[in-house]
Amino acid sequence: MSLLHIAVILPLIFVLIIPILYRFFKRIHLGWFVLPVPIVIFIYMLTLIKTTMSGNTVMKTLNWMPHFGMNFDLYLDGLGLLFSLLISGIGSLVVLYSIGYLNKSEQLGNFYCYLLLFMGAMLGVVLSDNVIILYLFWELTSFSSFLLISFWRERQASIYGAQKSLIITVFGGLSLLGGIILLAIPTQSFSIQYMIQHASEIQNSPFFIFAMILIMIGAFTKSAQFPFYIWLPDAMEAPTPVSAYLHSATMVKAGLYLIARMTPIFAASQGWIWTVTLVGLITLFWASLNATKQQDLKGILAFSTVSQLGMIMAMLGIGAISYHYQGDDSKIYAAAFTAAIFHLINHATFKGALFMITGAVDHSTGTRDVKKLGGLLTIMPISFTITVITALSMAGVPPFNGFLSKESFLETTFTASQANLFSVDTLGYLFPIIGIVGSVFTFVYSIKFIMHIFFGQYKPEQLPKKAHEVSILMLLSPAILATLVIVFGLFPGILTNSIIEPATSSINHTVIDDVEFHMFHGLTPAFLSTLVIYILGILLIVTFSYWVKLLQRQPGKLTFNYWYNRSANVIPNYSEKMTNSYVTDYSRNNLVIIFGALILLTFVTVFSVPFNINFKDVSPIRIFEVCIVILLLSAAFLILFAKSRLFNIIMLSAVGYAVSVLFIFFKAPDLALTQFVVESISTALFLLCFYHLPNLNRYNEKRSFQLTNALIAGGVGLSVIIIGLIAYGNRHFESISKFYQEHVYDLAHGKNMVNVILVDFRGMDTLFESSVLGIAGLAVYTMIKLRKKRQTQGNEVKNHE
């Protein structure tokens, strides 16, 4: 196992250790034990920067199921390293922050188990080269985020937000699964790098469009793009460390990673470019507009996160244009990839810090309601300083890093509008227009975020707590991120050669080696647009109280949340009514529906699909086999007319023993012995329970009722016969029995084929079947024990009386 594999599974291994630490070290905050895990991973990832800077990659394989093409393959290039550094670096700061945020009275064992589970899953997503393994980790991120969002499960809003996020992201995960399967069909491989190398085969495949649509749905749901963004605001019910980690730097970036990783395969399609770009721009505009009307600090940050993700998504779409050009023209459009990567880093820094400051304000005052907040400038000066730095970066104000990436974004929109790629050239001018409008509202909500908390009148009578500056543990992590905001803004070269260029080269087919960011480029369209953004933004802030009321009057039926909630209520109710219409408490009626459907399906298939019934290879029927079958049928027939339960038990046993004899005739002594033992044990159990069973009652059933039963029973028997004959006479594949005959000894080192199949080739089936029996036995034992306990308690009460 390589160090890269260890880095991925280290958080998952530590999940198993946390319960022990939580059990024996309750006096020490559990976060101190967890903190070294992301720090170690981050340091290891830093050592790999030289590898990716030189244009090399790391490929490590761990065999899992090689016969099925599913191995634990890890591939690290510039893009994977970037995300790994974000996951582990921001993860370290979040764990440190959580030590000050979460009290030791909280269920810290659960919290850190969920957090490390998510961390390991995210590392698996960004480093997996096998798409099936990527999908497994992808779904694990959805599952672990569900657990984190619902951490305060006593709150109904937390449960609602967790369920909502799970439903939408799992829907996207299923779409992703369909897409990667369609990708694997033309390439006959699950390797992402192999698919990229053979992208032309995928592009010529009839499944290309369907795979592209399904993968885009998977990415859009994960990264909260329009119209799937509705889960992210409700996910803000999670503890603030979760929001700072999942919803600023990691989980919501998984969709962006998927789009970036799949760009070399799908960039040849103009549909990919248009869809990714427009969805990103629409998300940017819609979310930034909605962020301005939020009354909750986390609500503002939630919609701002959606907005910023839309900006990055749009840049990834514009960058895909570079695949349609060569030379310098290609590099012009590939600059959009560079801008996307840079803003992805910047967003993680300023948004992570803003989430942490929001948690600090909530921790200090007991509320996040902007109507109750204000005037905290002198009370929380350190928090104010951090907020100003990071919020201005989000607004795109120099000299912070957000200004550089926002300028790069505007440049890419103007560049895209001039591309001769699209059939309708005028639509290209929508790109800079939407980008500018979205940036105006971004400027507004960023400045208002500062004003809501620190300016205005201080209202202590409306605050649940007396406001105070929070502890150093809660300030250290956002302070580090705020410092990075300044450093990356003033010295972007720190990132360009080491992180941004290798990551961009991983997406683009052209090597990017001349990335530069400057505060001032001259009077370019992007710079002039920035001035327009500042002017319009200030005007909107001055008139904020007038126009925001119009947004807050938006009819509920025009929101996606309304239709989601309506569907969430209507679908279960309709399903329940439909189920109750045919499912009853009478098992006989339920069996009639099930068996009737089987009979109908069998006969429809018989009369609609051509088939052959071949009797050439059928073995001859011997007289003693006929005698046993007659005995078996007679015993089964007599059960219908039995008047005592004991007679029923004897006849059922006769049927079982007759089957055992047939197994002997068919040269399967192991099956015969097994059947004989099972029948003997079941008969003995029946007889032991016989004494406790009530008397057998006979009911006078109507003739039509009996006729229906007879028709259903006869139809099922006939269906089974027909299915058996069709299966025997229409073998489209070679029998698997030959495989067992050839490999029973070589692979399993056994001579008894039946035993080897049960305990080796199908060992997992046998294991789970045994587990089910064991669980059922424990359940019966528990119910009997509880019943005896209640009887004993009842007797004691009577004696006491």
Curated annotation (Swiss-Prot):
The gene is mnhA1. Keywords: Antiport, Cell membrane, Hydrogen ion transport, Ion transport, Membrane, Sodium, Sodium transport, Transmembrane, Transmembrane helix, Transport. InterPro entries: CPA3_Na-H_Antiporter_A, MrpA/MnhA1/PhaAB, MrpA_C/MbhD, MrpA_C/MbhE, ND/Mrp_TM, Proton_antipo_N. This is Na(+)/H(+) antiporter subunit A1. It comes from the Bacteria. Signal peptide: none annotated. It comes from Staphylococcus aureus (strain bovine RF122 / ET3-1). May form a heterooligomeric complex that consists of seven subunits: mnhA1, mnhB1, mnhC1, mnhD1, mnhE1, mnhF1 and mnhG1. One of its GO terms (cellular component) is plasma membrane. The chain crosses the membrane at residues 1-21, 28-48, 79-99, 117-137, 166-186, 206-226, 265-285, 300-320, 337-357, 373-393, 427-447, 472-492, 522-542, 591-611, 623-643, 646-666, 671-691, 707-727, 764-784. Mnh complex is a Na(+)/H(+) antiporter involved in Na(+) excretion. GO terms for molecular function: antiporter activity. Belongs to the CPA3 antiporters (TC 2.A.63) subunit A family.
